[in-house]
């Protein structure tokens, strides 16, 4: 990687963020595409967010990525939002267009790009969880033409979940339903008619917990996905694979959301195949 007077900067902004794999992904992409850029991690307090965004203009940066807790808090400092970022109400990528800062959200795009043989159009999808990741995935599914999306949460979270998806409910005609995750009978019944089941919660990061009953039976044509990539195989994915069901972890989502941001910044396609091999060497060891 060369750094000279023409090198442009990109960064990921969050707190905490020093653990992030994003600098590894993007700097490898800059190197392999011969784009003169460098990517760093900025761990900042909220009081520095406005100035950090202004620095994108000041230093003619490509832009920034954002993670928690700034995906929503950054919006007032931007000049505009992409359609998906408007629907989600959160931004993970800011693009500098000649000094005009536009917020995008590539999380949903990244998720579906990681499912190589799955097209959301006219499908029935079940999502576990209603947080930021779930909202990004559901929004992208709606934009891509999903027929029905069912969102499963704990009973005490049902009211909040519906409110969290209010904008999407008001502005789209996709059939969205909200259900109690503890109702195992209803869950199993709907699962028989479902094309894709997604765990969009953090349950399973400990390598032990399951977000659903261990007695759940998966239909043979189902695709199962988890947004978690550490551990490489969660108990949720292990349950699916034990039943010989195709199962995908969250490492691809991490890579392809980065690829979406890289394309917006540089106009270049990230060499995802080569970078995927490097990531697998790190996480599947």
Curated annotation (Swiss-Prot):
Pathway the protein takes part in = Metabolic intermediate biosynthesis; chorismate biosynthesis; chorismate from D-erythrose 4-phosphate and phosphoenolpyruvate: step 4/7
Which UniProt keywords are given for this protein, alphabetically ordered?
A: Amino-acid biosynthesis, Aromatic amino acid biosynthesis, NADP, Oxidoreductase
- Residues that hold shikimate according to the record: 20-22, 67, 92, 107, 229
Could you state one GO biological process linked to this protein?
A: amino acid biosynthetic process
- Which amino acids does the record list as binding NADP(+)? 129-133, 227, 250
- MF annotations from Gene Ontology: NADP binding; shikimate 3-dehydrogenase (NADP+) activity
* Entry's EC annotation: 1.1.1.25
Membrane-spanning parts: none
What Pfam family is a match for this entry?
Answer: SDH_C
Q: Which reaction does it catalyse?
A: shikimate + NADP(+) = 3-dehydroshikimate + NADPH + H(+)
Locate the active site: 71 (proton acceptor)
PANTHER family in the record, alphabetically? BIFUNCTIONAL 3-DEHYDROQUINATE DEHYDRATASE_SHIKIMATE DEHYDROGENASE, CHLOROPLASTIC, SHIKIMATE DEHYDROGENASE
Q: Which family does it belong to?
A: Belongs to the shikimate dehydrogenase family.
Q: How does it assemble?
A: Homodimer.
Q: Show the HAMAP family listed in the entry.
A: Shikimate_DH_AroE
Function of the molecule: Involved in the biosynthesis of the chorismate, which leads to the biosynthesis of aromatic amino acids. Catalyzes the reversible NADPH linked reduction of 3-dehydroshikimate (DHSA) to yield shikimate (SA).
> What protein is this chain from?
Shikimate dehydrogenase (NADP(+))
Q: Which gene encodes it?
A: aroE
